[in-house]
């Protein structure tokens, strides 16, 4: 199943009246069927297994070496941008289109990806696809909200409001950890959440969302 080039939906860019539409062609099997992991380092019952399964079946993220997903491997920004372009058939734009000149001093695609980096990339990509990004969450509910970079605050607020990013327990507090690194497992989980939020049928079925 994995390794074939398939995308069972397409994102329609425009005014956002119709966000996603089914394409003809191959689609995944019923998402609630038991999944047999093709990876030697991913068990079916791990917290990140649904995300790994989803990005594998969509051919968005690929194995590292022979049958290894490397779920704990750190995701870098350029690799995540490539995943977004693969997922949305280039609708999120090139590096220059996604991050115009005003972002140059604040955001570069070089280096490993933090949680706020991931939020910014998904936020910009979602905006470019004509999908409503006005929802906002309350960053002040997190004890480290002041650590979020100014340019990343709209994206982080949106990611919290949509449920893409969730708080991390740190003692008695809940933190955002905006400067924390992002693993491949975390990235694929957020992609699954994004597709569920946007109404992608397989993603919603996999998470049991009606």
Annotate each PLM feature.
Residues 162-164:
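Short, charged, amphipathic alpha-helices and their helix-cap/turn boundaries
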Residues 1:
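Short, aromatic- and glycine-rich surface loops/edge beta-strands on solvent-exposed regions
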Residues 9-49, 57-117, 124-153, 166-184, ...:
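Feature responds to low-complexity, polar/acidic, surface-exposed segments characteristic
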